[in-house]
Swiss-Prot record:
Disulfide bonds: none annotated. It holds the Pfam family HTH_8. Activates ribosomal RNA transcription. Plays a direct role in upstream activation of rRNA promoters. Residues 74-93 bind DNA. Keywords: Activator, DNA-binding, Transcription, Transcription regulation. GO terms for molecular function: DNA-binding transcription factor activity; sequence-specific DNA binding. Homodimer. It comes from the Bacteria. This is DNA-binding protein Fis. Belongs to the transcriptional regulatory Fis family.
Length: 98
């Protein structure tokens, strides 16, 4: 579950452990851990287009959730994301979300 703390620009990830305790950590920490795991699995192999891979992993769910939150209102979604509507439409098309 992703939450944004009030009065903060830090997105957090909430997790529940086996004792039903909820912990929160910044989204960037989860991304960093995912990248560490990814690099560990590479065993020294070269990687191409890592930026695009990571961006797609974050951008697609971001678009999905923003479009759900705005009930499909592209103008409002673009404003929330700080991009113009044409750019939003292009990104939605890229991920087959149009």
């Amino acid at each position: 579950m992703f939450e944004q703390r009030v009065n903060s620009d830090v997105l957090t990830v909430s997790t529940v452990n086996s004792q039903d305790q909820v912990t929160q950590k910044p989204l960037r920490d989860s991304v960093k851990q995912a990248l560490k795991n990814y690099f560990a699995q590479l065993n020294g192999q070269d990687v191409n287009d890592l930026y695009e891979l990571v961006l797609a992993e974050v951008e697609q769910p971001l678009l999905d959730m923003v479009m759900q939150y705005t009930r499909g209102n592209q103008t409002r979604a673009a404003q929330m994301m700080g991009i113009n509507r044409g750019t939003l439409r292009k990104k939605l098309k890229k991920y087959g979300m149009n």
